[in-house]
């Protein structure tokens, strides 16, 4: 894990060959949906493990079948709330849950519009109650412009007081990190790699494409609400 000296509280895993190999698979245009999802799960699980190294631990006394000894327990692992940004972050959350089994989970549906305005629409928020002892982990594979996460953080800060807020992603653009850190300097960011830049359409380059489409398939637009009302 490397601390990026351009910002305070920003870390990448560019020094970890296993994660870099997984990222290489995700970048590859020939990687299919199933393999892409599995790759996101692997990244979430390993990055969750690395994140536990930054949590507080305390020593305890225990008794083995042979004698008394000392051990350690995490003071934070049972006080974690993972917030998933629909839909691309689901596999990332699945990996995190494998490491942070006691975590509570919240879901936020947020989408970013097209260039040049990149308007953000949030139409579903379901987040469990957060305490001052909790660490909030926001899972979002791609930190591009940062606008989606800034909106999410703004909503969370209105009503929730936590011990710590962490953004965990796969790729980030420097522009997105700049925006987030200017708005919320205390938020920590952990990503597999920080890429070069955003292109004119707001995509990270070299990037890996649309993480949601590559994990679950390209969607088509359909309106189900009128039909659902008719079922009653």
From Swiss-Prot:
The UniProt annotation places uracil binding at: 204, 209-211
Q: Which reaction does it catalyse?
A: UMP + diphosphate = 5-phospho-alpha-D-ribose 1-diphosphate + uracil
Q: For binding 5-phospho-alpha-D-ribose 1-diphosphate, which residues are annotated in this chain's numbering? A: 87, 112, 140-148, 210
Q: Which UniProt keywords apply?
A: Allosteric enzyme, Glycosyltransferase, GTP-binding, Magnesium, Nucleotide-binding, Transferase
For this entry, list what GO says about its biological process. UMP salvage; uracil salvage
Molecular functions (GO terms): GTP binding; magnesium ion binding; uracil phosphoribosyltransferase activity
Pathway the protein acts in: Pyrimidine metabolism; UMP biosynthesis via salvage pathway; UMP from uracil: step 1/1
Q: Which CDD domains has this protein been placed in? A: PRTases_typeI
Q: Tell me the cofactor note.
A: Binds 1 Mg(2+) ion per subunit. The magnesium is bound as Mg-PRPP.
Q: How is its activity regulated?
A: Allosterically activated by GTP.
Q: Give cofactor(s), names only.
A: Mg(2+)
Residues binding GTP = 38-42
Q: Belongs to which family?
A: Belongs to the UPRTase family.
- This protein is called Uracil phosphoribosyltransferase
Naturally occurring in which organism (per UniProt)? Methanococcus vannielii (strain ATCC 35089 / DSM 1224 / JCM 13029 / OCM 148 / SB)
Q: What is the lineage of its organism?
A: Archaea, Methanobacteriati, Methanobacteriota, Methanomada group, Methanococci
Q: Which gene encodes it?
A: upp
